[in-house]
């Protein structure tokens, strides 16, 4: 075969003039190259120093195959789909198990990324969930929580992606302690939905961190239970309660507007009336304590929504994921790609509020 002949000739040239080294037979090996499986007879030398250039070329092709597999998997293709594409490109059929073996390195890389050290301080941290179909004993939706942070240089990064089957205070304590163990010492403000138990454990792990509950989620939950004939008016009232144009607003004044709103609608809607009875709802107004130029950036978790759209686009071509590990791996790949893109651009409005820069 031509490749074997090339390697034999290459060894002959290599050994010319080397009195202390000679040929030492061949070893068999198999590789994929030029669209098919190749049986190679690799020449050896007695000192074990000879390395044919042909092998380097084949290794380059193998690396290209792995890189392409990673990229296709990261874009949501299944191992079967990747195998079909590889067969068209390289002319050799790759089974699901073969592709899984190739992508095992990809799994390891994503795990290392999720466990990487984090910065000591983050100006703001956002937590939001995306729900994906996961196959365990049966197929069902599970929540994956994305934690995104604004760094001291005003750029963003995904700090963690975590699968929590059910919310609880102990679960959130474990999550926050996890990012603390990876190096986080302080957080300016943490923005989240009304997640069960989170408000209780934040001060236990990051004692000086302020908590802002997502106003957009609150509005959505309120309006979902309002009759169509009242929706426009309730939405307008909520717009006045959470008025972003009032630069001199205070938490106390805004919260009183919230109580008045609750009392106004309590006869028609019990769920709105109940809002006035929960003092923890004051956490929806934490954003007012900060400079008016960043209030729109910290009163909602919508900053993660752009990333969630990328997640949904990637998972759209998958009916369900075979395991939560595979879902975590795919989410990690998408997040890493976005960190190299728009998340690298600084959000300079955060420089207007020095309170968020305080290392606590």
Question: Where are each of the predicted segments found?
Answer:
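Acidic/histidine-rich catalytic cores and adjacent linkers
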Residues: 241-360
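Electropositive nucleic-acid engagement tracts
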Residues: 2, 18, 27, 77-124
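Short, conserved DNA-binding cores of transcription-related domains
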Residues: 1-56, 345
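Short, amphipathic alpha-helical "recognition" segments used to contact nucleic acids or chromatin
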Residues: 64-76
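Conserved beta-strand -> loop -> alpha-helix junction used to position metal-binding or nucleic-acid-contacting
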Residues: 189-196, 201-239
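RNase H-like nuclease fold core
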Residues: 41-46, 53-58, 64, 92, ...
């Amino acid at each position: 075969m031509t490749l074997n002949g090339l390697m034999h000739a290459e060894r002959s040239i290599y050994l010319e003039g080397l009195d202390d080294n000679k040929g030492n037979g061949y070893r068999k090996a198999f590789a994929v190259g030029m669209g098919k499986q190749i049986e190679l007879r690799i020449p050896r030398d007695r000192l074990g120093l000879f390395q044919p250039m042909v092998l380097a070329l084949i290794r380059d092709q193998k690396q290209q195959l792995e890189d392409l597999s990673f990229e296709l998997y990261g874009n949501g293709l299944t191992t079967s789909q990747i195998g079909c594409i590889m067969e068209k490109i390289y002319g050799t059929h790759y089974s699901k198990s073969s592709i899984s073996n190739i992508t095992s390195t990809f799994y390891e890389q994503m795990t290392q990324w999720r466990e990487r050290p984090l910065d000591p301080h983050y100006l703001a941290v956002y937590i939001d969930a995306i729900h994906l179909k996961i196959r365990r004993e049966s197929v069902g939706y599970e929540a994956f929580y994305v934690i995104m942070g604004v760094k001291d240089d005003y750029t963003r990064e995904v700090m963690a992606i975590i699968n929590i089957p059910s919310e609880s205070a102990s679960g959130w304590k474990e999550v926050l302690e996890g990012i603390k163990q990876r190096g986080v010492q302080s957080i300016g403000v943490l923005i989240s939905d009304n997640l069960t138990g989170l408000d209780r454990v934040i001060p236990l792990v990051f004692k000086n961190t302020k908590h802002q509950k997502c106003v957009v989620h609150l509005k959505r939950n309120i309006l979902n239970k309002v009759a169509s004939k009242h929706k426009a008016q309730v939405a307008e009232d909520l717009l006045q309660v959470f008025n972003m144009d009032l630069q001199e607003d205070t938490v106390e004044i805004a919260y009183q507007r919230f109580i008045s709103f609750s009392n106004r609608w309590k006869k028609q809607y019990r769920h709105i009336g109940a809002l006035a009875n929960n003092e923890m709802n004051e956490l929806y107004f934490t954003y007012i304590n900060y400079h008016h130029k960043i209030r729109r950036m910290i009163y909602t978790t919508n900053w993660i929504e752009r990333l969630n759209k990328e997640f949904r686009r990637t998972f759209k071509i998958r009916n369900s994921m075979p395991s939560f590990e595979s879902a975590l791996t795919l989410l990690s790949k998408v997040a890493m790609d976005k960190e190299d893109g728009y998340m690298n651009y600084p959000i300079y409005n955060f420089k207007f509020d020095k309170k968020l820069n305080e290392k606590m």
